């Protein structure tokens, strides 16, 4: 009888030990990212998963006109949802983007002005993106959501300006730790109704592996610089904006899932706004931009 009880205890002990070994093996079998291993990076989560993001965009402008400071800060707070749609293209994704919420305001020495965003909250539009993010397009440009802030506060703002931050261009070939790739693209800068064109040259470097919000990510650090050019005729005068911009970003790409989890960008620019006409003017201008984007549940 004693031998039988001892035998049962031994069987239980062995079973527990085997269970522990299985658990340890299972936990250890989840392959972690290796900084020295090559990974092929592609945007692909949108095929099977909705992704929601919170983005905060801040733009500070410092300028002086006829001896009077005209400083302003514009703040945009977004929540938007990416949903995959059926696409005939194997190398691109068709996404529906829903603007779930947006708060927009401008702060000056005279106080704070909030912009009416009710007409675009909850609205959607489509976007096509290539697997590497090198091409972004809009099948129905007339669907794009615009926020009219008035000529002096920033003009009509097309919301595609924030989306590029979600899709930095990925390298065509697999990358491993320390490797660099480059990207060139255009976007508009917010400054009154001028909204000058920014021609950006960016350099991306894979610098580390890191877990962010539960995802195993490649950490990428980027630097970029740009020439800024814009012109417009207003009130019988021709206005031009010429300047330079430089900035840096940190972004985290979930390799297995195929999407950017988090982005943080800082930029500074300097330029000159000139006008022609009976009373020509030359106004120096400086701007600081910060962008923070992260996925939310």
Q: Residue ranges of each PLM-predicted region?
A:
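Bacterial N-terminal signal peptides that target proteins for export
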Residues: 3-16
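Bacterial N-terminal signal peptides
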Residues: 15-23
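Signature of exported/secreted
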Residues: 27-297
